[in-house]
């Protein structure tokens, strides 16, 4: 494969002069900051947040780089993974000309971001066992295809994509392959971050929203070769990650062992929930999961979904998603939350039985 990054980047991005702050240009430790029109008198809060945050999130990158055996220059910290997804389209997708390949059923923001950025979406559906259709993906690629998005473990199906299949696509495609690993920490497979130095067109996305339990902070990560990361930094807003979020992430990174225990607990609850869901006659299939949720095929997803809403329990109705007819996606909750879900489903099952008996005797 001949990979030419320069040829993939939009012309306006190549010519872009990124926003530059005086602090970025200053070398050394300044003591007085009169450059950014901040409020030097502070705020009503006890802790001062009157200064802009580190635009490069240096400390976070240094810690994460050590864990992943990469360089800090190979990491981009984003305002949630959705920012990184959007920036990929801005960097590589020429509006009204270029194309992206997605593999439904998959995470919906790939298509939304493509449409916002006027990039045409090509759909190559997963196989019947929710794996990549390599042959059809290759056939869908043409000279306008700039990006391929792969979600692994996949949302909403929950399963890992085969590593060898992903790498075959990465190795043969001259554009950018984005592997979204939002749920990788719940799976037995190691991350593809280890492959970024062997594949210059590979971008791996991760997040602090799932395993780390920090969805409210909106922090995502992109791992890629240094030249791609430079493009992210050129296009991103100058202060895309808040000071509060950066401080919280650094604090969380000190408690990795607690996160590992949480992951183990979620996986244990996942397996227990799967076993209990099998007892219901309206559950026809539970798909294998490498994530913190399960995709459940039912006889009547709409009725079950509405019943649970009445019980004040919200699950995700995937009935109208390609290849997911009759399916609900259920996040693994706490033991108490899962028990409440099961009790509500038992209530529904009892009502179904009573209705059936009444019909038969009537």
Q: What are these model-predicted stretches?
A:
Residues 1-59, 63-66:
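N-terminal "arm"/small-domain region of PLP-dependent enzymes with the aminotransferase-like
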Residues 164, 310-311, 320-353, 358-362:
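PLP-dependent enzyme catalytic core of the Aspartate aminotransferase-like
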Residues 266-267, 279-311:
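Conserved PLP-binding catalytic core of the aspartate aminotransferase-like
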Residues 91-113, 127:
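Conserved PLP-anchoring active-site segment centered on the Schiff-base-forming lysine
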Residues 57-99, 117, 298:
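Phosphate-binding glycine-rich loop
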Residues 201-279, 286:
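PLP-dependent aminotransferase class I/II
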Residues 128-187:
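Active-site phosphate-binding strand-loop segment of PLP-dependent enzymes
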Residues 104, 120-128, 206, 318-319:
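Short beta->alpha connector loops at strand-helix junctions that form conserved
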């Amino acid at each position: 494969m001949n990979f030419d990054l320069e040829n993939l980047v939009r012309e306006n991005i190549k010519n872009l002069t990124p926003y530059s702050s005086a602090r970025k240009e200053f070398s050394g430790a300044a003591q007085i900051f009169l450059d950014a029109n901040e409020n030097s008198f502070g705020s009503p809060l006890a802790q001062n947040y009157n200064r802009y945050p580190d635009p490069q999130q240096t400390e976070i990158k240094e810690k994460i780089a050590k864990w992943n055996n990469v360089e800090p220059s190979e990491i981009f910290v984003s305002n949630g993974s959705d920012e990184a997804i959007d920036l990929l389209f801005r960097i590589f997708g020429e509006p009204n000309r270029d194309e992206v390949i997605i593999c439904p059923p998959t995470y919906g923001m790939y298509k939304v971001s493509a449409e916002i950025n006027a990039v045409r979406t090509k759909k190559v559906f997963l196989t019947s066992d929710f794996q990549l259709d390599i042959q059809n993906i290759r056939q869908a690629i043409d000279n306008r295809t700039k990006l391929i998005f792969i979600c692994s473990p996949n949302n909403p199906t929950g399963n890992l994509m085969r590593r060898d299949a992903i790498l075959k696509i990465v190795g043969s495609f001259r554009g950018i392959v984005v592997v979204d690993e939002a749920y990788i920490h719940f799976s037995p497979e190691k991350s593809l971050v280890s492959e970024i130095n062997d594949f210059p067109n590979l971008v791996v996305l991760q997040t602090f929203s799932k395993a780390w339990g920090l969805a409210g902070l909106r922090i995502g990560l992109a791992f890629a070769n240094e030249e791609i990361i430079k493009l992210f930094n050129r296009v991103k807003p100058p202060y895309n990650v808040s000071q509060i979020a950066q401080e919280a992430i650094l604090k969380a990174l000190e408690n990795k062992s607690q996160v590992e225990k949480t992951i183990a607990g979620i996986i244990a609850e996942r397996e227990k929930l799967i076993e209990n869901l099998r007892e219901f006659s309206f559950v026809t299939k539970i798909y294998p999961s490498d994530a913190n949720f399960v995709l459940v095929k039912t006889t009547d997803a709409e009725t079950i979904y509405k019943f649970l809403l009445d019980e004040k329990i919200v699950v995700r109705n995937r009935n109208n998603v390609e290849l997911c007819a009759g399916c609900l996606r259920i996040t693994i909750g706490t033991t108490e939350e899962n028990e409440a879900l099961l009790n509500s489903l038992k209530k529904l099952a009892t009502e179904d039985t009573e209705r059936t008996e009444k019909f038969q005797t009537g």
